[in-house]
Amino acid sequence: MSRPDIPFPQSPVLPTMVEGTHVIEFSCHKGIGCWNACCSNIDISLTPYDVLRMKTRLGISSTEFLKDYTVPYEMDKDSIAGVKLRPVDAGTACRFIKPEGCGIYEDRPTACRYYPVALLSMRKQDEYVDRDSYAIVKEDHCKGHEVNRRITIADYRKEQGLEEYDELARGWRQLVLKKQSSGPSIGKPTLRSRQLYFMACYDIDRFREFVSAESFNKLFDLPQEEKAALLVDDVALLQFAFRFLRQVLFGEESIALNAEAAQERLAKVQEKRLIEEREAAKKRALEAESEADEGFD
């Protein structure tokens, strides 16, 4: 299984998992003794849909949001990048914290909505389907667990608006899990593939420019009606970005290539296969020679 994704991207230990039917006792509301405490020392990983919602709420481009409000981090060594919410300058508090609570509450990130629950997306190496489980986070400062309010995780997710957030980030989680479960079999990502991944997942406005470019038209045979609809709908464009990445990173073709581009791609694949076959034959010959030499010793 892969390691959990958010909010424990670096944890080597798998927390105790529970299902959506698990009942928690929890409430967070103004007036509770720990109000705003969890927002004073943040470590919040953002999903691509989080970035989309927050940049729209702030009325800025995704490029500006990434520059001013996030910091990048590696999900795994030599792997794809994630982004975390940048705290206040020279501090650890969330930049959106106010005495009355969150300043962008309606568009708050997934991790904030889930707290004190953690989403654990898993995928077995021989499966494509990801499976969601949950873990309960208990921190010393949090008084919410002392409130006698029982609710299942499934109902808590509905209450916090997480069904929409999880569904629109599922394509991204599947990409992350596929990369993590594939491991060395697909090799270390190239700089170009890491840049494409980061742009398509997080910088949706730059990705729109990328899809609008003539070079994209020359490579992909995307119907003009579909393309026009994508360019005016951030959410649809983000889902398309996940399809695009599955194709360019893992070869799962769902976007048609232009005939000339398809021929060129086929030629490159055949050339790569020929090189691999030659290398394999060379390796077998060297092994056979080594075994023959040992036989004469």
Task: Outline where the language-model segments fall.
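Short loop/turn segments that flank or connect secondary-structure elements
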Residues: 1-37, 44-46, 50, 56-63, ...
